[in-house]
């Protein structure tokens, strides 16, 4: 076969080759997004989501939704702009959870023997469903940024409460009152640097009363609106068509 001849012999074979290339491209793009989103998550909210004794009512509730609304906004905008697919945020979050569970099982448990109920990742699926549903029903990025991103921030703590509630039960341990998550932190020693020597319910944000989770959630929701609005432009930028002019 010469260089000028086609590598396929029929239209059906050409279609099959095209579909194979599409699946290979989707496979590569999916894991590139999973890897980059996972690295972004680990470098930003990292420790607050690594350990059960860091999943508190103040910083974990505030930081995690703000820094993780980025990739869902961009991917959702791209898929909606190009293909009118309303599940970009959900697919993005499911990919992140896949990468996190692989990391927690093989690295945290397989190499360092931290138990899974000490290093489990947070659930972001409820917020992603809200983002996709609002965009699908409204078709407006502005409305999705205001309502959807606010729902993303507000639903984060209630969506994870069934998972972390058993670890926040107060117990007496050696004459001290602490949570089960704090006991896990004492028994599974990590690094000795000062930022790891903390207790989950010793925060200082007590101006608004006893429970600070609603304050943290509303602040996180407000910031998520701004971050979503900025990052959705990245997805729209990637969805633009560009042509090279012939000379």
Curated annotation (Swiss-Prot):
Which Pfam families is this protein grouped with?
A: AMO
Record's keyword annotation contains Nucleus: no
What is the recorded membrane topology of this protein?
A: Multi-pass membrane protein
The transmembrane residues are 23-43, 59-79, 86-106, 111-131, 145-165, 215-235
Q: How does it assemble?
A: M.capsulatus has two forms of methane monooxygenase, a soluble (sMMO) and a membrane-bound (particulate) type (pMMO). The particulate type is a nonamer composed of three alpha:beta:gamma heterotrimeric protomers assembled into a cylindrical structure; the beta and gamma subunits comprise the bulk of the membrane-spanning regions and the soluble regions are derived primarily from alpha subunits which form two antiparallel beta-barrel-like structures each.
- This chain's protein is named Particulate methane monooxygenase beta subunit
Task: Specify whether Transmembrane is a keyword of the entry.
Answer: yes
Top-rank taxon, per record: Bacteria
Query: What does the miscellaneous comment read?
Result: Products of both gene copies, pmoA1 and pmoA2, are required for full cellular activity.
Q: What is its EC number?
A: 1.14.18.3
Q: Report which residue ranges the record marks as coiled coil.
A: none
Q: Mind naming one GO cellular-component term on file for this protein?
A: membrane
InterPro entries in UniProt: NH3/CH4_mOase_suA_sf (IPR037001), NH3_CH4_mOase_A (IPR003393)
Where it mainly occurs, coarsely classed, is: membrane
Reactions catalysed according to its record: methane + a quinol + O2 = methanol + a quinone + H2O
């Amino acid at each position: 076969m010469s260089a000028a001849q086609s590598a396929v012999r029929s239209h059906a074979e050409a279609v099959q080759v095209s579909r194979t290339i599409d699946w290979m491209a989707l496979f590569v793009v999916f894991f590139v997004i999973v890897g980059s989103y996972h690295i972004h998550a680990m470098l930003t909210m990292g420790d607050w989501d690594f350990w059960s004794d860091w999943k508190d009512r103040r910083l974990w509730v505030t930081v995690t939704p703000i820094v993780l609304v980025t990739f869902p906004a961009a991917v959702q905008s791209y898929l909606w702009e190009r293909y009118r697919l309303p599940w970009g945020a959900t697919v993005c979050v499911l990919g992140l959870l896949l990468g996190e569970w692989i990391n927690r099982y093989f690295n945290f448990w397989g190499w360092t023997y931290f138990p899974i109920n000490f290093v489990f990742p947070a659930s972001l699926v409820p917020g992603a469903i809200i983002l996709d549903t609002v965009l699908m029903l409204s078709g407006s990025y502005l409305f999705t940024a205001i309502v959807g991103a606010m729902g993303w921030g507000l639903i984060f703590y209630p969506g994870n409460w069934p998972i972390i509630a058993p670890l926040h039960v107060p117990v007496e341990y050696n004459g001290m009152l602490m949570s089960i998550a704090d006991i896990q932190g004492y028994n599974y020693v990590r690094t000795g640097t000062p930022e790891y020597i903390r207790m989950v319910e010793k925060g200082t944000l007590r101006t608004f009363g006893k429970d600070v989770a609603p304050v943290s959630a509303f602040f996180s929701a407000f910031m998520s609106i701004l971050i979503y609005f900025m990052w959705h432009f990245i997805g729209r930028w990637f969805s633009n068509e560009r042509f090279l002019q012939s000379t």
